């Protein structure tokens, strides 16, 4: 049986510190703001749910994509291709 705690596994992700920094401080102001897509793996659903109320409304979650912070219009190598830049 797999006894790994999904919440603990979330903290081992390579991009965790980068995401946490953006979640706490927001993005730097620019003249051309972008939406953020925060994809999560199914094993991270518990952690994602714990952050839901703390995330800015411009952050979106896609459960089937590779863990990474994507910006609107950025190309991804997964089946979804380009991230929709019209996400509101």
UniProtKB/Swiss-Prot annotation:
N-glycosylated. It is found in: Secreted. Expressed by the venom gland. Keywords: Antibiotic, Antimicrobial, Apoptosis, Cytolysis, Disulfide bond, FAD, Flavoprotein, Glycoprotein, Hemolysis, Hemostasis impairing toxin, Oxidoreductase, Platelet aggregation inhibiting toxin, Secreted, Toxin. Signal peptide: none annotated. Substrate binds at residues 81-82. GO terms for molecular function: L-glutamate oxidase activity; L-phenylalaine oxidase activity; toxin activity. It is an enzyme of class 1 (oxidoreductase). The keyword NADP does not apply. It catalyses: an L-alpha-amino acid + O2 + H2O = a 2-oxocarboxylate + H2O2 + NH4(+); L-leucine + O2 + H2O = 4-methyl-2-oxopentanoate + H2O2 + NH4(+); L-phenylalanine + O2 + H2O = 3-phenylpyruvate + H2O2 + NH4(+); L-tryptophan + O2 + H2O = indole-3-pyruvate + H2O2 + NH4(+). FAD binds at residues 74, 81-86. GO terms for biological process: apoptotic process; defense response to bacterium; killing of cells of another organism. Its cofactor is FAD. GO terms for cellular component: extracellular region. Its EC number is 1.4.3.2. Belongs to the flavin monoamine oxidase family. FIG1 subfamily. Catalyzes an oxidative deamination of predominantly hydrophobic and aromatic L-amino acids, thus producing hydrogen peroxide that may contribute to the diverse toxic effects of this enzyme. Is highly active on L-Met, L-Leu, L-Phe, L-Ile, and L-Arg, moderately active on L-His, L-Trp, L-Asn, L-Glu, and L-Val, and weakly or not active on L-Gln, L-Lys, L-Asp, L-Ala, L-Tyr, L-Ser, L-Pro, L-Gly, L-Thr, and L-Cys. Exhibits diverse biological activities, such as hemorrhage, hemolysis, edema, apoptosis of vascular endothelial cells or tumor cell lines, antibacterial and antiparasitic activities. Homodimer; non-covalently linked. This is L-amino-acid oxidase.
């Amino acid at each position: 049986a797999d006894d790994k705690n999904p919440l603990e596994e979330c903290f081992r992700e390579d991009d965790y510190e980068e995401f946490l920094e953006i979640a706490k401080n927001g993005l730097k102001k620019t003249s051309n703001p972008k939406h953020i897509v925060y994809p999560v793996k199914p094993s991270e659903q518990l952690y994602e749910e714990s952050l839901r109320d703390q995330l800015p409304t411009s952050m979106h979650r896609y459960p089937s994509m590779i863990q990474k912070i994507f910006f609107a219009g950025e190309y991804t190598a997964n089946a979804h291709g380009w991230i929709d830049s019209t996400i509101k």
